[in-house]
Amino acid sequence: ATFSPTPKPSPTPTPPDLVDSYAVQGAEVASHQSDTMHWRIERIEQEGAVCYLTKIYLLDPGTQIRKATANWERDIQYPVDMAAKIPDATLFINGSGYVSPTFPEIPSNYPGSSPDYYYTPLGSVTVTDGQLFRCLTGVPYYGLSLTRDGLHMHVGDDPADVLAANPTQTWSFYIECPVIRDHQSILDPNWRFTTAPAMRTIISCIDEHNFILLTVTRDGSSALTMRQCVDYLQSAFDPLWTYNLDGGPSIALYYRLSPDDDWVRVAGGTSKDADIMAFAD
């Protein structure tokens, strides 16, 4: 009898790193590349606003995207202080918007009153390092979740469905903050930030391994409205989805070329936040 050797399984192809392939190129601020990660921060001017584009490739986003937080219900912290909790990160941005005596608004469908939520993120689900801090049953979730298979955006999902995927982290803000879904704008034309120029931190997912961060500053003659940001991201990158993280004085963009280096501030970082999103090798 003739026996054919069992064919070896094909190796899983390495997903493409798109950092160098986008048509839009700004002036390089810094870049970092390793076997598992590639990012480059670029300075651009868009409609009079000085902005930073951070192009990111991650081999395994489910483990390389990280979160650090302030103390639940007790305080908010400077982003660079929270980053000290993630020693292997080389890049971070600010994360969730939060409730405080200064920003006390909570949605009308949240149980309780604003002081019940002080110094915690907006959003009906909060998970940090796999630990559940909040689940408002029946209150739709508008935010991000990180699971073993990567980063996901939720647009009004049931908290039970979000938690069923066993997220390790969440980040969230206003219900209007998912602004692009399935390559289409879902920006609410009546949201006050749609037409108000502001400093912003926005994350776009190109595919499961490639992301674009847009950091909008007030260093130029103007900031950008959310409509300007969405139009720009769609025309330049056509993202799968886009989510608006905390903005205004809360923006932060920092990098370091190795975990042994001190953090370098690119933008923001001067106000305290509830949490950060970091990227590690």
Kindly label every feature range from the protein language model:
Residues 75-77, 162-169, 222-230:
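A short, polar/proline- and glycine-enriched secondary-structure boundary/capping micro-motif
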Residues 92-95, 242-246:
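Active-site neighborhood of phospho(di)ester-bond hydrolases with catalytic His/Asp-centered motifs
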Residues 69-74, 157-162, 215-221:
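Short, solvent-exposed aromatic-acidic interface loops
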Residues 101-192:
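Active-site-adjacent helix-turn-beta-strand microarchitecture at beta-sheet edges
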